[in-house]
C-alpha cells in the first residue's frame, strides 16, 4: 500500500512540474495536450534564433517594438517620434534636430520596403498620425534615419504608410478634412464645399531610401481612414478607404452614418506623376496639388459598405477587399472589372468631379464574415483572414469561392492583425498575430489599466490554433512579420562611416 501511495505521489508531482503553471478555468487531459503542443511550436531555446521578426507600431509611445516569432519575446524598442532616454535618442544633436522640436508622436502602420511586391528588408516606414509626419528606419542598424514633415496640407496622417510594389511611393493622406492651405479659416456650416481632404504619395529614392513629397491629390471632405497599394495587375493603383461621405458635422456617430455605403478611393499614381510633369497642378500650401476636376483619369471612387476601415489587396493583386466595420460583410472588388468600368465610363455619379464607379459592375462578392470586420491578411493557400472587432474573432475564408471555412475567438476586441508576410505577393502561411484592444483576465493583475494583447495563431493547417498570449505597451496599430533571413543587420559600423 505504501509503495502504491509513493508511486501515486511521484506521478502527481511529475504532472505538476511538467505543467509549471496555474491552470485557470475549465480543462482536462485534452487541454493539457493542446498546451503542450502549442509550447513545442513556440519555444525557442536559449541561443537559438527566431524565424521571423515582427515590427509593431507603438501608438502614442511614438516608437516601434521589435518581437521575435514564434516565441513572441520582445527584443528591442526602436525610438522614432519620441525621445528615448535609455539610448539618448532625442537628446543628442542629430536626433534632436530630426525630431524638429516635437516631443511625442502617434506611430501607426509600419510598412517594410518592397521589391516586386515582396519585403526586401531594407527600410521600415511608419507614420505619425498626430503630427502628420513620416519616418524611415534603416533595418541595417535598426535606427531612425529620417523624419519627413509635417506634410503640407495633410491633417491626421492616419491612412499611411503603405509601400507601392517597388517602394516608388509611400501612401499618405488626411483623416480630417480642413480648409486649405493650413491656417486658413472657413465656417463649419460650409464644411461640404469649403473643406478638403488630401491623399498623397511620398517619393522614395530607390538607392538611399530618402523621402520627399511626390504628389498630392485634392479630395472631397471625407475622412480618409486606411489604405493599401496594388500588386501585379493593380500595381499602378493606391487605395484609400473613406467614411463620412455625407460631409456631415456635429454628432458624427449619427450624422456621418446615414448612407448605406461610403467609398474606397482608387488613385492611379503613374497618372498623378504625369500630371505633375505636365504642369497640371496648382500650388496649395507651397506644394503641387492635382485637382481631379481639372485632370481626368487620376482618381475614382468605389462604393463600399458603410464606414469601411481596412482595404487590403490580395497577393495576386486581383482583389481589393474593403471591410465595412458597421456591417457584417467584406466587399471584394475585382481589378479587371474596375478597369473595364473605367474604360466604359460605367459611372453612377460623381463627387466633386471624381467619378463613382457602378458598384454592381466592379464587385465580385460580399462575404458575410461576421460582426465588425476591420482588416484582412492572406496565406499561401488562397485564404484570407479578417479581424472581427465586435465578435472578437478571426474569420478564415476562401478567395474565389467566398466561403468562411473557419473562425477562432480571440481575447478581446481585435483591431489589426498580421500574418507571416501576409500582405505581400508571397505569404508564407505559418503564423498570424491578433492585435487585440483588451486583455482582461489573461494575465496577472496590474491594476485598472490593462496591457494590449497579442495572440499568436497557427494558420499552417486546415484549422486555426491559438499558440500564445503576449502583452504589449498600448497601442499597436498594425504590425508586419518578415522572415528573419531577409534582414542583414550589422553589429559593427564600417570604419569609413565613422565621421
What are the residue ranges of the model-derived segments?
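Bacterial N-terminal signal peptides
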Residues: 9-16
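Predominantly soluble domains enriched in secretory-pathway, periplasmic, or organellar proteins
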Residues: 21-499
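Bacterial N-terminal signal peptides that target proteins for export
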Residues: 1-7
